[in-house]
Amino acid sequence: EMGIDFSTDFYNINHVNSLGARKYTDFLENYLCLNYNLPDHRDDATYSEWQTLAENYALTSDSSQVAVQNLIENANGAFEIAENIRNADDFTVWATLVNDERFTVITAGNCGFSTIDLKPQYISLLRQLNLCDIYGGDNYIKIVRNADVIGSNADGSCSATANIGHNQQTVPCTVDNNNSMAAIYIDGINYSCGNSSNINMVVFDNYHRTVVDTVYLYVEDGMIKIGRK
């Protein structure tokens, strides 16, 4: 009866967002007006604080609804991009798709290639992903969202941690390169391909808090290639 849509009107499992709140309060208002003879306290000095709250809400309501709608569109768009990421076999396509604020890319392992092994366009793609320091190391870790580094082992340690997701809706990510085997734990589960002689990469959907893809990289004829389990 309220018209609440579980796919668009909830902030989390227990709370509606501003779209759901408007539907709920509109329904409640109509129900009370139809079924009860309630006095109208608008412009009543005794309820002036309520009037102020209503006016403040009116000032921010439209912008809040637009922000929520944009968030929903971003999240829905992530589904389509995620499917394209999983189906991409060409690294140039794959790297372009994952370089998006809706995804976090976790990279770890042993990079067995250098810039001299790569054609220029692949060097450029790695730079765009903020992986320009990836070359030649056997203990590489970097956690990147939209080219922004949110975790790494720049101190030379064999592990790194970060919280990944959107706003306060995050999960823990721990990367461990001990024993020459890259492990990429997201919410306690290891999603790495586990290739000891390759760079391993995991793509995480920040909005839906799910793993989109897990791959490893290798070089062939100057081109970066994608491998999957």
Residue ranges with predicted function:
Residues 1-79:
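Extracellular glycan-modifying ectodomains
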